[in-house]
């Protein structure tokens, strides 16, 4: 398996762990890996009446910084644009309040299971 395929598989595993964690917290899934010309939304969830756009970040090594630090201004802008397109295409959710959350999956210390942190309202649109 190539490094890129291995990385993609690990990313999908992190997204599945994050989704399962959020479901246990009472959120409902509206979409997974929703793609558009602007990018991809890892998870789209519903928390009460709030539409939640969730970015999942995984890190195996801290040498490049933590998972949260990897979401720079450019990535945030792509997430916001993707969320706007989601709401245009899925009009039934357009009038609901929205927020952007981040779930970090940390496997840097070899813990089993990995450490998950759910950061609500991680950034503003």
Curated annotation (Swiss-Prot):
Mind giving the lineage of the organism this protein is from? Bacteria, Pseudomonadati, Pseudomonadota, Gammaproteobacteria, Pseudomonadales
Which family is it part of?
Belongs to the UPF0102 family.
NCBIfam families according to UniProt: PRK12497.1-3 (NF009150), YraN family protein (TIGR00252)
Its protein name is UPF0102 protein PSPA7_4996
One GO term in the molecular function aspect is:
nucleic acid binding
